[in-house]
């Protein structure tokens, strides 16, 4: 007897990838995620490859993982994939201190974010 298999978190024609601790604010990552929402997966990879935003590097890695999951784990057609969902949220925040004059210090906040990308296979029209 083994443990029952957990139900899928996405639909049958969908694949998921999550980047959990991406160094940077959720606001900056959401700007990059907005560039690829609803686009074809191949076009989204090109947009991220030529984007000047620093967060595009990490977003491209998560998208590449979602495409690989679709191809290898769920046997979906890579050419028919569309970025169905690209949601961003906050993760941890590292706290650091910066020493200042007269024996004082100030707090530095170093935010991390999460990126969840779902790709869906669509029929060519």
From Swiss-Prot:
Gene3D superfamilies: Ribosomal protein L22/L17. GO terms for molecular function: rRNA binding; structural constituent of ribosome. GO terms for cellular component: cytosolic large ribosomal subunit. InterPro entries: Ribosomal_uL22, Ribosomal_uL22_bac/chlpt-type, Ribosomal_uL22_bac/org-type, Ribosomal_uL22_sf. CDD domains: Ribosomal_L22 (cd00336). This protein binds specifically to 23S rRNA; its binding is stimulated by other ribosomal proteins, e.g. L4, L17, and L20. It is important during the early stages of 50S assembly. It makes multiple contacts with different domains of the 23S rRNA in the assembled 50S subunit and ribosome. This is Large ribosomal subunit protein uL22. It comes from Novosphingobium aromaticivorans (strain ATCC 700278 / DSM 12444 / CCUG 56034 / CIP 105152 / NBRC 16084 / F199). The lineage of its organism: Bacteria, Pseudomonadati, Pseudomonadota, Alphaproteobacteria, Sphingomonadales.
